């Protein structure tokens, strides 16, 4: 039986959208889909090949991010005016950052957070690295984990077709909780092990079709191709997730 942790926050506390000092990211996906390596790469740990036979439990990590880092991340791509080639889809999804999600970032970092930025200088980012979810039923613990999340990263292994297919079940469960709790929790899809070109079984075209059918778009920073081993797009992935959290919280505050 697998053991899964929760963030430990009380659901009776203030709504997550009013927490301006922390962001909670849950990383989900099949076992051995590269979740742990992705998280540890972002935390600055050295890359290690996972032992497929090793039993593991869910882990909760912390990392402090300066709020200015998010502002600089936005301004970098705003000034360049180009969407980074995160997914190998640049030719099909070319355009400026303003064309694809300009209002999305502009409102968040310039308008919505103008006063917020003056009150805080850093964000405590809590990353919850889960083990494989039981998709056959929705447990109370799984519901709690999703409800406590500010955003969810769904990982699949570019060399394992079944890990991509599993995402549909994960997304259905997350959407169910989102509707039930009336929460707009951002979901970002991450393809791991993109450095293993010779072993890759999932083509860019297949990924694009799959994520578009589920309502996701690389142009909206919904999808990233990553390599934990060579630290490809890892930092960009997590910064984009944090930007999405800022917007989600801002939108939620306006409704309350």
Swiss-Prot record:
Binding, ATP: 29-36
Keywords attached to this entry: ATP-binding, Nucleotide-binding
Pfam families (UniProt xref): Ras
Annotated GO biological process: intracellular protein transport
UniProt keyword annotation of Nucleotide-binding present: yes
SUPFAM superfamilies: P-loop containing nucleoside triphosphate hydrolases (SSF52540)
Cellular component terms per the entry's GO annotation: endomembrane system
Presence of keyword Magnesium: no
Disulfide bonds: none
PROSITE patterns listed in its UniProt record: RAB
Transmembrane residue ranges: none
Source superkingdom: Eukaryota
GO function terms (MF aspect): ATP binding; GTP binding; GTPase activity
Annotated protein name in UniProt: Uncharacterized protein YHR022C
Species, as recorded: Saccharomyces cerevisiae (strain ATCC 204508 / S288c) (Baker's yeast)
């Amino acid at each position: 039986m697998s053991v899964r942790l929760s963030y430990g926050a009380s659901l009776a506390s203030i709504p997550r959208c009013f927490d301006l000092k922390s962001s909670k990211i849950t990383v989900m996906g099949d076992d051995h889909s590269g979740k742990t390596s992705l998280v540890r790469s972002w935390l600055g740990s050295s890359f290690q090949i996972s032992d497929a036979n090793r039993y593991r439990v869910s882990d909760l990590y912390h990392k402090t991010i300066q709020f200015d880092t998010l502002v600089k991340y936005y301004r970098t791509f705003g000034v360049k005016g180009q969407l980074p080639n995160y997914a190998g889809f640049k030719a099909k999804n070319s355009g400026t950052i303003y064309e694809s999600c300009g209002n999305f970032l502009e409102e968040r970092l310039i308008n919505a957070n103008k006063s917020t930025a003056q009150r805080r200088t850093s964000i405590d980012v809590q990353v919850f690295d889960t083990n494989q979810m039981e998709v056959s039923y929705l447990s109370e613990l799984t519901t709690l984990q999703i409800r406590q999340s500010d955003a969810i990263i769904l990982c699949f292994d570019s060399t394992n077709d079944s890990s991509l297919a599993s995402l549909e079940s994960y997304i259905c469960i997350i959407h169910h909780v989102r509707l039930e709790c009336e929460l707009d929790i951002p979901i970002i899809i991450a393809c791991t092990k993109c450095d293993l070109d010779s072993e890759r079984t999932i083509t860019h075209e297949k990924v694009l079709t799959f994520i578009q059918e589920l309502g996701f778009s690389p142009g909206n920073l919904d999808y990233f191709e990553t390599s934990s081993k060579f630290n490809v797009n890892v930092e960009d992935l997590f910064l984009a997730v944090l930007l999405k959290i800022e917007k989600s919280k801002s939108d939620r505050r306006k409704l309350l």
